Amino acid sequence: MRKQSTTILTLPDFSKTPSIDQVGVEERVARFQTRSIKKESKVQGLKLALNMIDLTTLEGKDTEGKVKQLCYKAAHLHDVMQGIPTVAAVCVYPTFVKLAKRCLEGTNIKVASVATAFPSGQSTRKVKISDTHFAVDNGADEVDMVISRGEFLEGNYSYVFDEIAAVKQACGTARLKVILETGELSTLDNVRRASEIAIYAGADFIKTSTGKISPAATQPVTLVMLETIRDYYYKTGKMVGMKPAGGISTAKIALQYLVMLRETLGDKWLSNEWYRFGASSLANDILMQLQKEQDGVYQSGDYFSKD
């Protein structure tokens, strides 16, 4: 059931958003990529990354059968290997939320739903709010919305802020992840500004991408977003989550993202309450790497289910 929020949101002066030193960002990312992870820490990191995944299917050809299969996989990873955690959530279109909730009943796996005319965001606010209400009323624990990139790029920051705040209110008790679609924002300065708008408007998480355009998540963009979260935390004491999504398909890259997370935000963010990976194939590679660490042998990719 939806509950009305009484939070009063105020709009800071986003013209004072600091400029980003792109060279400095790239240098910091390069340092994270050189970190060596020893075996015991690697296994711990792989399990943590697995527990942070939003296992996702967001295709026009999605069917009830595919969603059921995805939910089964999410709930039965331990059938493949003992002692591993579940994923954090399954992410689907609003029309499949009720089905996913039914399939995952009795587990601690959340159901996330995209909304607000995903992935383009090209619709009226009324339609976006209705889309959000539909997802929440059908049981979505989390909502992944998209910002209006056209309005943002035209400098209509108040419009973007107000829309996010309205969707946040429509979410009630469901957590809100705000997708910036960083591949369409062109500059790191824009990524920083969009991150600030989303955070101040009430985002529980900020998220890089829909996964529908290229580039999707990149490490420089993710670092800028993490640093925005850090600066907001220093100023307010409030934690905001982060979700890189799209293009993260290997365990090696996921571990690099976790190193970046820990060294930028600290251990408090090292849980799926505050960090997620949006992915469809990452889980399989993590399972393969865990099997290798356990048995010393790589399984064929076909050993693990694809969906």
Task: Name each region found by the language model.
Residues M1-L50:
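Charged, compositionally biased N-terminal leader segments and the immediate start
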Residues E40-L48, K61-P85, T95-K243, S249-S280, ...:
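Alpha/beta enzyme core
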Residues L58:
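A short, histidine- and acid-enriched strand-loop-helix "catalytic/donor-clamping" loop
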Residues D285:
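N-terminal beta-loop-helix "entrance" segment that forms/cooperates
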